[in-house]
Amino acid sequence: MSFQTLITASELDHLCRTETDVVILDARFHLDNEDWGDRAFAESHIPGAQRASLATDLSGPIIEGVTGRRPFPASADFERTVRSWGVGPSTQVVVYDADRGLMAASRVWLMMRWIGHDAVAVLDGGLPAWESAGYPMTAEATSPPAPEQTFVASVRPHLLAEVDEVDRVRVDTPIRVFDSRGPEGYHGQGKYYDPVRGHIKGAGLADRAETLDDDGTFRSPEDLRVHYDALRNGQDAGEIIFYCGSGVTAAQNVLAMEHAGLPGARMYVGSWSEWIVDPDREVEL
């Protein structure tokens, strides 16, 4: 049995003690301080974990006037990264984050699936859940895996939505395109990382924070199904597209739908930061 959406702290502890083909990834990241995750990892991490940096491992080159702030890397580049982590065809990958468990972890989950690896799960509740349960942390450097695994990418482009499709369906009824940033970002308020404020014209709001309970773990599949059934309004899950500021946190909604037994939702990787590079694309507050 593999874990393909979420894994609890106790399940991860058991996995570490009973299985050998397991790769743990630390994806901690802070938008205001991109070096913070690297420093936090060096100070303390789950034993055996390796670093998965949003800035260097999980993002490709920015093309001015074309891409958003966090484009996916080329599949061949990410394949090499996955191999360097020691991931093979049957490896169970577990990824964790801080700050209620989700900043970049859900993006890693989606990227692993995009490149063809299903045995990947996010630590439910993130590092706070692991630490509050009393499980160990270490500052010891993790030895690089040897030999490098022979993971071969099998890209699934259907897991993502491109800008042309988003532009085509954004005014559909019922709503198909949803902004994951929360009410402030949706309405162009609060702190912004892009020069234009607002949201894609016609998009609905699907605040990613609503997928979590007060303790930072995901709501139950039953609760999430009710939540997403209201958003879908009778549509198939595969009709739904989520975006955010730069294609990172929107993956949390995709993961939550999968956890709820509603597979097929997609993420628009370019998100708001790509949408606004073309002044002819419509926006609203």
Per-region residue spans from a language model:
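Cytosolic catalytic domains that perform sulfur/thiol-centered chemistry
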Residues: 1-285
